[in-house]
Amino acid sequence: MIDETLLEAEEKMERAIEHAKEEFGAIRTGRANAAMFSKIVIDYYGSPTPLPQMASIGVPEPRMVIIKPYDTSQTNAMEKAIRDSDLGVNPNNEGNQLRILLPQMTEERRREMIKVARHKGEEAKVAVRNVRRKAKEELDRLVKAGEVGEDDGRRAEKELDDLTQRFVGTVDELIKHKEAELLEV
């Protein structure tokens, strides 16, 4: 019972970390990457579809992105969605593809993005701690019901705390890495 609870908690914490990595990937740095377009959704014949499912996204240069739609009739819709997004970029429509030159980020914008990264990191830490809280409640319930001994319960709680600290440390590393990436000129 204890092993199952700890295993489930670890899986949920790993999912929280994966979600945080996705969120960090969508934060724009001074460098181009395909993940920054993952949150952009286009209305494709009535159904909202993420941009990466509708086009190939290439990064030929550090500050340039080329988006080649699979269906060229959607190029204008993609251009509008990118322009309306919070990325602050202006795509050039070349008919069969979109070319996006990323402007150099200002110091103010970098600081703003660092705040966003820290906020996303705190959200990930809260998610990890919530998983810990739920797992601890389950462990307490098992001890109270007499399904496991108190010593085993305390040992499992210590393992849970170690697990939580490890994942919170991982989030801290992700934040540090993203900050360094954002401060790089």
UniProtKB/Swiss-Prot annotation:
Q: Which GO terms describe its molecular function?
A: ribosomal large subunit binding
Q: Where does this one sit in the cell?
A: Cytoplasm
Keywords linked to the UniProt accession? Cytoplasm, Protein biosynthesis
Gene Ontology CC terms, in alphabetical order: cytoplasm
The principal location of this protein is cytoplasm
What Gene Ontology biological process does one annotation of this record name? translational termination
Q: Sorted alphabetically, which Pfam families does this protein's record hold?
A: RRF
Similarity remark = Belongs to the RRF family.
Function, in words: Responsible for the release of ribosomes from messenger RNA at the termination of protein biosynthesis. May increase the efficiency of translation by recycling ribosomes from one round of translation to another.
PANTHER family given for it? MITOCHONDRIAL RIBOSOME RECYCLING FACTOR PSEUDO 1, RIBOSOME RECYCLING FACTOR
Q: What is this protein called?
A: Ribosome-recycling factor
- Origin species, per record, is Salinispora tropica (strain ATCC BAA-916 / DSM 44818 / JCM 13857 / NBRC 105044 / CNB-440)
